[in-house]
A protein has these predicted regions:
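Phosphate-handling architecture centered on phosphoinositide signaling
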Residues: 2-163
């Protein structure tokens, strides 16, 4: 078995360097390193909790789209968010349990996934390329998700942005 004479030393050096970098990344703030504070535009616009936002979906044949929601296929639409219009955006119904719940209840209140860059690569809503609109069909208060996500955020747990 042919081995380089310094393989052990190289492996030890790589291991020590990895450990040092790990410690730096985990304790960066206590060592004086500051995290990037660059907020994306959608965080302050769409997820501003001081107001109620409007999201309007404009399609030529809404009824046909609703009838085919269970296929979970993207369809072209326009989206107007708080007065800002975005054309040639993709939308589809999302979910598994929620899709079957909507069907069982005889409702048309689907959850949707909006994809801004599905047809036009690079198109975003102030940096956001996908947006989920949840139907909250099993939440009569329509507040559980919002309250849990906000609570998780206050405790420092990674959670989706919500509004």
């Amino acid at each position: 078995m042919a081995a380089h004479k310094k393989t052990d030393r190289i492996c030890c050096a790589v291991l020590i360097l990895s450990l040092i970098l790990t410690v730096l990344f985990m304790n960066g703030e206590s060592l004086g390193l500051q995290a990037s504070a660059a907020a994306l535009g959608y965080e302050t616009r769409l997820f501003d909790t001081t107001k109620v936002h409007t999201v309007d979906i404009v399609m030529d044949d809404w009824d046909s789209f609703i009838e085919s929601c269970e296929n979970e296929e993207y369809s072209a639409c326009a989206v107007v968010i708080d007065g800002e219009s975005y054309k040639n955006v993709a939308i589809r119904a999302k979910g598994n349990t929620s899709l079957s719940s909507v069907r069982q209840l005889g409702s048309q209140r689907y959850s949707f996934k909006i994809e801004f860059d599905h047809y036009d690569s690079g198109k975003t809503y102030h940096g956001l390329d996908k947006l989920c609109l949840n139907n909250l069909i099993q939440d009569n208060t329509m507040m559980k998700d919002y309250l849990v996500y906000r609570l998780m955020g206050q405790f420092g747990v990674a959670s989706p942005l919500c509004s």
